[in-house]
Amino acid sequence: MSQLDLNALNELPKVDRVMALAETNAQLEKLSAEERVAWALENLPGEYVLSSSFGIQAAVSLHLVNQIRPDIPVILTDTGYLFPETYQFIDELTDKLKLNLKVYRAGESPAWQEARYGKLWEQGVEGIEKYNEINKVEPMNRALKELKAQTWFAGLRREQSGSRAHLPVLAIQRGVFKVLPIIDWDNRTVYQYLQKHGLKYHPLWDQGYLSVGDTHTTRKWEPGMAEEETRFFGLKRECGLHEG
């Protein structure tokens, strides 16, 4: 696979960037998740970061990447509305895996946001998008800038939703390389990895949650529901971090 120039690629239109990365992605599809991480660390520029929402299967990518690159900064965008079990899970995994956790938050506290805007998540798609911009997108952009990131690892998988079904292993987002090492893993592979390494699902998994975000926009799975319907009242799947 040829060397990639981030600055040159950023100057291209999005369609041309996709085409420029096509050959590399074809080769990356043939590699294991561990090999993809190793390739990225060898061939893509630093600084390197890993983002995590500490969701249902978060332990997989946290363990996988941190094993190969110990002390990699792990970015969490904390909305202040996560489940108590999520905060406990964050503490547990940070201690168990010795994570270099970097927490980023909005400039306005949750209470101040509610005073200013009301409950944005109850204001339809437009309100949800504004909420996500304030609490997810802006803090992530700030994290990438402050940590001088040029290569960003994330734990997205194609099986999780229609919006992720065609994502490549390697892309450029927010001006940096984005690497998705476990993009082609199915639920069985995730389960086997967790079992092999003595890792746990998020505590709410046992209560019927397939996906976990904020308390006010996360629903327990019910028979007949698609996984996408458990988040943002079925209006959206993505929180904004992995769009654009």
From Swiss-Prot:
It is found in: Cytoplasm. One of its GO terms (biological process) is sulfate assimilation, phosphoadenylyl sulfate reduction by phosphoadenylyl-sulfate reductase (thioredoxin). Its main location: cytoplasm. One of its GO terms (molecular function) is phosphoadenylyl-sulfate reductase (thioredoxin) activity. Keywords: Cytoplasm, Oxidoreductase. It holds the Pfam family PAPS_reduct. It catalyses: [thioredoxin]-disulfide + sulfite + adenosine 3',5'-bisphosphate + 2 H(+) = [thioredoxin]-dithiol + 3'-phosphoadenylyl sulfate. CDD domains: PAPS_reductase. The active site is at residue 239. Pathway: Sulfur metabolism; hydrogen sulfide biosynthesis; sulfite from sulfate: step 3/3. The keyword Cytoplasm applies. Its EC number is 1.8.4.8. One of its GO terms (cellular component) is cytoplasm. PANTHER family: PHOSPHOADENOSINE PHOSPHOSULFATE REDUCTASE (PTHR46509:SF1). Catalyzes the formation of sulfite from phosphoadenosine 5'-phosphosulfate (PAPS) using thioredoxin as an electron donor. Belongs to the PAPS reductase family. CysH subfamily. NCBIfam families: cysH, PAPS_reductase, PRK02090.1. This is Phosphoadenosine 5'-phosphosulfate reductase. It comes from Salmonella typhimurium (strain LT2 / SGSC1412 / ATCC 700720). The gene is cysH.
